UniProtKB/Swiss-Prot annotation:
Entry comment on modification after translation: Phosphorylated at Thr-9 following detection of ADP-D-glycero-beta-D-manno-heptose (ADP-Heptose) by ALPK1. Phosphorylation at Thr-9 by ALPK1 leads to the formation of an intermolecular binding between the FHA domain and phosphorylated Thr-9, promoting TIFA oligomerization and TIFA-mediated NF-kappa-B activation.
Quaternary structure and partners: Homooligomer; homooligomerizes following phosphorylation at Thr-9. Interacts with IRAK1, TRAF2 and TRAF6. Interacts with TIFAB; binding to TIFAB inhibits TRAF6 activation, possibly by inducing a conformational change in TIFA. Interacts with ZCCHC11; binding to ZCCHC11 suppresses the TRAF6-dependent activation of NF-kappa-B.
Name of the protein in its database record: TRAF-interacting protein with FHA domain-containing protein A
This protein's UniProt keywords: Cytoplasm, Immunity, Innate immunity, Phosphoprotein
Domain of life: Eukaryota
Lineage: Eukaryota, Metazoa, Chordata, Craniata, Vertebrata
Amino acid sequence: MTSFEDADTEETVTCLQMTVYHPGQLQCGIFQSISFNREKLPSSEVVKFGRNSNICHYTFQDKQVSRVQFSLQLFKKFNSSVLSFEIKNMSKKTNLIVDSRELGYLNKMDLPYRCMVRFGEYQFLMEKEDGESLEFFETQFILSPRSLLQENNWPPHRPIPEYGTYSLCSSQSSSPTEMDENES
């Protein structure tokens, strides 16, 4: 037997690829704390996203983001060998939109294999690659130069600012907006 035959087979690892976009990403450095490469994490870890670097694994440099915006947790469905992700909205101020479903504070759902996650002006295209390992999973971030909604033909959803005003880094559309007769 050769050393090749004796070598342990390496397990593949489940990976969640997240393509991210925000209109102010270049001017404001919103994603500057995020490493745009693959990162291996223990499968027991609850991964939190938000602006508080003491609590969150992935932080956004934006005061409009909640201290903890949302969390992802890996799990295995009963009688299944496939690992899945669960997403939970941790923000009391802003709903999290997964595809077309709105999640309020503490609402959670299974993350589809491919979906769009949005809050405010943030857009995340999340795509899962299955793996065999039960010990670890990986995350990978990719920065998109343009809106993911337009690029992937997702239904539009108007961003809702937390406090009724946009931050300096938010983009404001100069195109006409359709309004109801009773709106001012």
